[in-house]
């Protein structure tokens, strides 16, 4: 009887996470996968908001996007987009794939 108890204690000490009473299964990101009755069910975890002890983490540093940053990205991409569309329209017209007709304005 004592040897059986000693073996069980040794097995518990060797097995990782054996004394942890949380959901059993693999942890993937912010969701624990737990074997359930119909396959795997997911239990949400708040590891991004709180620490393991339950303390709330401080707010992350907020990066401010000024108008200069927004315009420095938007304006060049708008310009490149208009150049691409203008060149593609000229290519279509050159190969007579799409030629706009000016005769339709007399309705």
Curated annotation (Swiss-Prot):
Keyword Ion transport appears in the UniProt entry = yes
Topological domain ranges for the Mitochondrial matrix compartment: 48-65
Q: Where is the transit peptide?
A: 1-47
Q: Where are the transmembrane segments?
A: 66-85
Question: Sorted alphabetically, which InterPro entries does this protein's record hold?
Answer: MCU_reg (IPR018782)
At the top level, the lineage of the source is Eukaryota
Free-text note on domains in this protein's UniProt record: The GXXXX[G/A/S] motif at the C-terminal part of the transmembrane region mediates interaction with MCU and is required to activate the calcium-conducting pore in the uniporter complex. The poly-Asp region at the C-terminus mediates interaction with the polybasic region of MICU1.
Known function:
Essential regulatory subunit of the mitochondrial calcium uniporter complex (uniplex), a complex that mediates calcium uptake into mitochondria. Required to bridge the calcium-sensing proteins MICU1 with the calcium-conducting subunit MCU. Acts by mediating activation of MCU and retention of MICU1 to the MCU pore, in order to ensure tight regulation of the uniplex complex and appropriate responses to intracellular calcium signaling.
Q: What is annotated about its quaternary structure and interactions?
A: Component of the uniplex complex, composed of MCU, EMRE/SMDT1, MICU1 and MICU2 (or MICU3) in a 4:4:1:1 stoichiometry. The number of EMRE/SMDT1 molecules is hovewer variable, ranging from 1 to 4 copies per uniplex complex, leading to uniplex complexes with distinct gatekeeping profiles. Interacts (via its C-terminal poly-Asp tail) with MCUR1; the interaction is direct. Unprocessed form interacts (via transit peptide) with MAIP1.
Q: How is this protein named in the record?
A: Essential MCU regulator, mitochondrial
> From which organism does this entry originate?
Mus musculus (Mouse)
Organism placement in taxonomy:
Eukaryota, Metazoa, Chordata, Craniata, Vertebrata
């Amino acid at each position: 009887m004592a040897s059986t108890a000693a073996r069980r204690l040794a097995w518990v000490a060797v097995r990782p996470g054996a004394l942890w009473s949380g959901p059993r299964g693999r942890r993937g990101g912010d969701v624990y996968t737990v074997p359930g009755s119909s396959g795997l069910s997911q239990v949400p975890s708040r590891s991004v908001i709180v620490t393991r002890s339950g303390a709330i983490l401080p707010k992350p540093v907020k990066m401010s996007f000024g108008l200069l940053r927004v315009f420095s990205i938007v304006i060049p991409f708008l310009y490149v987009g208009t150049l691409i569309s203008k060149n593609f329209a000229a290519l279509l017209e050159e190969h007579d794939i799409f030629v706009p007709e000016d005769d339709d304005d007399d309705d």
